């Protein structure tokens, strides 16, 4: 009964002091009664309390899964920058100005696109050998006219990344929640 009376007093004071900017009565104390109604509801239901407790406990393991995902993206982005960072940008392929391994943020964004399953096969095919190199990435004293970029490592790289994201990471994330 005390919680209901406190809530009614809170609503009444809020309505009365709504027009006044400088109210003398601090109504923050009465707002605690609204929270107490929720606590009272949770204390009655054993199932709701168990569900809430499980939900809170699962959030304790969530940062570790997030850290694992960040580490996976970081490692694969650095490897991708080293192996595929010199591929020339071409708007007709999947390696273009929006999707490339030339900078770290672009590499992470490209990996996020692959992790969601959006055209990762085409990106993999665009990173295979015999692709043109970016003219800005070649050394000035390079004499090779047919210098090609890309690597056969792309097949292992993209399939392993997709498998880790699709099966291991997503399953861990769902298992924690």
UniProtKB/Swiss-Prot annotation:
The record's section on InterPro entries has: Ion_trans_dom (IPR005821), VDCC_alpha-1_subunit (IPR050599), VDCCAlpha1 (IPR002077), Volt_channel_dom_sf (IPR027359)
**Single GO MF descriptor:** calmodulin binding
Pfam family of the protein (one) = Ion_trans
Q: Which residues are glycosylated?
A: 90, 141
Which GO annotations describe the biological process of this protein? calcium ion transmembrane transport; calcium ion transmembrane transport via high voltage-gated calcium channel; calcium ion transport into cytosol; cardiac conduction; regulation of cardiac muscle contraction by regulation of the release of sequestered calcium ion
Q: Which residues lie within the membrane without crossing it?
A: 107-125
Q: Where is this site: Calcium ion selectivity and permeability?
A: 118
Name the reaction it catalyses.
Ca(2+)(in) = Ca(2+)(out)
Q: Which GO terms describe its cellular component?
A: dendrite; L-type voltage-gated calcium channel complex; perikaryon; plasma membrane; postsynaptic density membrane; sarcolemma; T-tubule
Task: Name the principal localization, coarsely classed.
Answer: membrane
Query: SUPFAM superfamilies this protein is in?
Result: Voltage-gated potassium channels
Keyword annotations for this protein? Answer: Calcium, Calcium channel, Calcium transport, Calmodulin-binding, Cell membrane, Cell projection, Disulfide bond, Glycoprotein, Ion channel, Ion transport, Membrane, Phosphoprotein, Postsynaptic cell membrane, Repeat, Synapse, Transmembrane, Transmembrane helix, Transport, Voltage-gated channel
Q: How does it sit in the membrane?
A: Multi-pass membrane protein
Q: Where in the cell is it found?
A: Cell membrane; Perikaryon; Postsynaptic density membrane; Cell projection, Dendrite
| Quaternary organization | Component of a calcium channel complex consisting of a pore-forming alpha subunit (CACNA1C) and ancillary beta, gamma and delta subunits. The channel complex contains alpha, beta, gamma and delta subunits in a 1:1:1:1 ratio, i.e. it contains only one of each type of subunit. CACNA1C channel activity is modulated by ancillary subunits, such as CACNB2, CACNB3, CACNA2D1 and CACNA2D4.
Role description:
Pore-forming, alpha-1C subunit of the voltage-gated calcium channel that gives rise to L-type calcium currents. Mediates influx of calcium ions into the cytoplasm, and thereby triggers calcium release from the sarcoplasm. Plays an important role in excitation-contraction coupling in the heart. Required for normal heart development and normal regulation of heart rhythm. Required for normal contraction of smooth muscle cells in blood vessels and in the intestine. Essential for normal blood pressure regulation via its role in the contraction of arterial smooth muscle cells.
Protein name as annotated = Voltage-dependent L-type calcium channel subunit alpha-1C
């Amino acid at each position: 009964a005390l919680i209901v009376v406190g809530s009614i007093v809170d609503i009444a004071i809020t309505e009365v002091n709504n027009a006044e900017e400088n109210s003398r009565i601090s109504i923050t104390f009465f707002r605690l009664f609204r929270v107490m109604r929720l606590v009272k509801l949770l204390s009655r239901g054993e199932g709701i309390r168990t569900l809430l407790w499980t939900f809170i406990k699962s959030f304790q393991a969530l940062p570790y899964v997030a850290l694992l995902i960040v580490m996976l993206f970081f490692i694969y982005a650095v490897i991708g920058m080293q192996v595929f960072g010199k591929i020339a940008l071409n708007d007709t392929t999947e390696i273009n100005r929006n999707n490339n391994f030339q900078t770290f943020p672009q590499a992470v964004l490209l990996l996020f696109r692959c992790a969601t399953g959006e055209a990762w096969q085409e990106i993999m095919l665009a990173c295979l050998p015999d692709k043109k190199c970016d003219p800005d990435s070649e050394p000035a004293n390079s004499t090779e006219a047919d210098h090609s970029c890309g690597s056969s490592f792309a097949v292992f790289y993209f399939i392993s990344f997709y498998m880790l994201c699709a099966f291991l990471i997503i399953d861990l994330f769902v298992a924690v929640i």
